[in-house]
């Protein structure tokens, strides 16, 4: 299993149009075969910061995700916005277990 943790900075005035693109991206990505979880969330303490959490079955599922039409549509939608990924890191993990 792969876990991707990413962070993006959205400029002032770009959050509303970015959120429309993000909602479509989350819905389409969660429907992909091999996607276990896919979520964006706004940081509560840092204005304009969005955290992205993804869980994929394997490398093939993640690679397939980057080739989807909705990934291309998302790139086009945010292309004109002040939206930049600050970091994105992929982790290899086992199935995990409850923390509590």
Feature map (PLM): residue ranges:
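Glycine-rich beta-strand-turn "strand-cap" elements at beta-sheet edges
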Residues: 41-46, 76-100
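Short, well-ordered beta-strand segments in beta-rich or mixed alpha/beta enzyme
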Residues: 2-9, 39-66
């Amino acid at each position: 299993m792969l876990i991707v943790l990413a962070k993006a900075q959205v400029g002032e005035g770009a959050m509303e149009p970015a959120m429309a693109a993000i909602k479509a991206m989350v819905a389409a990505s969660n429907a992909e075969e091999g996607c276990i979880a896919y979520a964006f969330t706004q940081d509560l303490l840092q204005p304009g910061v969005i955290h992205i959490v993804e869980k994929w079955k394997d490398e093939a599922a993640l690679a397939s995700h980057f080739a989807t039409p909705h990934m291309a549509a998302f790139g086009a939608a945010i292309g004109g916005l002040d939206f930049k990924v600050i970091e994105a890191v992929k982790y290899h993990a086992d199935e995990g277990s409850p923390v509590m």
